[in-house]
Structures are given as structure tokens and as C-alpha cells.
Amino acid sequence: MTATPLKVLVVGLGQMGRSHALAYHSHEGFEIVGLVNRSAPSNLPEDLASYPLRTDYAAALAEFKPDVVSIATHTNTHADYAVAAMAAGAHVFVEKPLAATVADARRVVAAAEEYKRKLVVGYILRHHPSWTTLIEQARKLGGPYVFRMNLNQQSSGAAWDIHRSIMQTTSPIVDCGVHYVDVMCQITDATPVEVRGMGVPLAKGLPEGMYNYGHFQVLFDDGSVGWYEAGWGPMMSETAFFVKDVISANGSVSIVMDQGAASADINAHTQTSRILVHHAGLDADNKPLKADEWLDMHGEPDHQGLCDREQDYLYRAITEDYDLTRHMNDAVASLNICIAADESVRTGQAVKL
């Protein structure tokens, strides 16, 4: 740990912002100097109640002069907030997606390079031991791959309020899809070349052109294909709401959840329960050469534990001077695929990358 903790300004106190703030609160290398939220947050955790709270981001940035700014606001504010923070001398943690457009995402990366600041994007699955195991096991199979992934959420109450708020600017396949496209890209290492998307507005009161259910296919230059689906709202089915399959000619790797997991439970979105590794090899009688393997992942970090890991990674990236070039470029690449999927939904045309 550094002798003097890094001063952090936390911007955005929604579901993710609070989790990140609690991570800074418990980390010896960070000191929260202020919180920023456009309105007075309700039910703020007791651990955060004593910190100064402001409503104006620019004024708070000038007042507190932080070493680090943590941004968990609406996606369309990410780029401007991040660039302003780095111009003021702060390192930045920003929730995914990095920005609302690919051009803005590249602008943020360019600012990190210009100001020589660290930029970490909130790809929480990169800090999850079970997901890194999934990636390792899938890579052992060799490509080309078929990716089948989704995350549908039968949301109501506060969860539906959060989803409707996000959909003022960002569709489900962009907001959630960047996580799983990032996983696909880590497994295949191939270049995505085309995206085809479809979506349906199943909920009333959505902004013009917005949809709460969507799915897309992404094609890679090694022959791999990926499918991702995301739907939010009280109408969503919980049947097969969490599919995580990677298939190749040599077998498959799948996440198998515990029965009874709820689709709107944020911990269920990252917990894996068990990983099933299936081998395709057959003997002379066309019988399996190797039995399926079950990797038990119970006891893994919960959602708060994963946020703690993310912020520890940020701390080490700053204090140990990590080269984050690949990290930043990957964030832009996964966003590019999901933005193309959103464009395909809206135009009805496949998008070449």
C-alpha cells in the first residue's frame, strides 16, 4: 500500500455506484473524499452516509481534486465525465459500457494516452475466478467456436425501475452484451467481421426506437459464430434465462446454475455454481473416450466481492503502473460489436465491421 491513500471521487450512486463506493470504503489504499449524485440518494448504506455529497460533478471535481474518479452514471455521460477527470489529473474507473458511441469510447482512450492516466473499465467478469476458468477451459478445446450466451431478467419493482432508467439511452444488448462479447473475444482471439441483430419493444413507455428484448449474432474471421440475447421486464420468461455455452469440434464448456436461481438477482448474474466440461472424442465403437468433468465453483465471490476485486485491480494498475493498452482496446472492441448489433436492430440490415 502507498503511504498516502488515493483520494477517490465517486460519481453515481445507483446499484453499481454504491457497490464500488463500498469497495473503496473498505480498501486501505483508497480514501473517499466525496460522492456525487444528481439527486439525494435513498437508503444510502450506513458506511457511506458520512461522506460529503454533491450534485454538481464539475464543481466537485474542482473542489475535491481527487486522484481517482469512479464513474457509474448513465452511459451517455461516461465519455465527457471521464475526459474531464483525466484532464484534471485523475485516473478513472468507469462502468461499462465505456461510452454511448464507439467514437466517444476512442476519445476516452485517447485522453488516457494524452494525459498519461490509468483507465479501467468495469468488466466485472474479468475479475471472476470462475469466468477465467471458463475461458481457459474453452481455449483448450480450440476453435472455431459456437458461443451461446444470454442474460434475461424478469425484473419488477426497483429492478424494473433501474432497467427503464438505463433504457432511456442504452438497450439491453449493449448494456449487458459488452460483458459476454468480451468473453467471446478472449476465447477466440479472432477478428469479428459481421453482426446481425433483432429486437422487439415488449414494454410500454419506452423511448422512441428503444426495445427491451434483443438478440444478435456475431461472425468472426476464423469461422466462429456467437449468439447473445438480453431481455428485461416483468414479462420475461425465466426459462433458460442464463445460457452460457461454448462449443467446438472437440467438445463444450458450459456454466450450469443451481435450480431456482432468480433472473433479477444481481448475484446470479455473475455466480457460476458449476462448470461442465464435455469432451467430443469417441472410441472405435463411437462411445465417449472421456467422461464429462464437473468443476465445482460454489464459494465464489458474491457481487460485492467482485466489485472489491475490481477496485483492487484499479489500485494495483495505478500503483504498479500496469500497461492497460490491451484492456482499453478490448473495451472499445466489445462496444463496437454491441453498437453494431444495436444499429442492425434499428436498420434491419447486417453490419460489416
Region locations from a protein language model:
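Predominantly a Rossmann-like dinucleotide-binding segment in NAD(P)-dependent oxidoreductases
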Residues: 125-208, 214, 348
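N-terminal Rossmann-like dinucleotide-binding module
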Residues: 1-48
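Contiguous beta-strand/loop segments that form the cofactor/metal-binding neighborhood of enzyme cores
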Residues: 181-267, 308-318
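Hydrophobic residues in well-ordered beta-strands that form the structural core
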Residues: 94, 119-121, 255
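Beta-loop-alpha module in the N-terminal Rossmann-like domain of NAD(P)-dependent dehydrogenases
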Residues: 20, 51-111, 306
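Rossmann-fold dehydrogenase core element
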Residues: 107-124, 142-149
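C-terminal helix-rich "cap/oligomerization" subdomain common to oxidoreductases
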Residues: 1-5, 68-70, 264, 301, ...
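C-terminal glycine/acidic-rich active-site capping loop/insertion
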Residues: 124, 220, 243-329
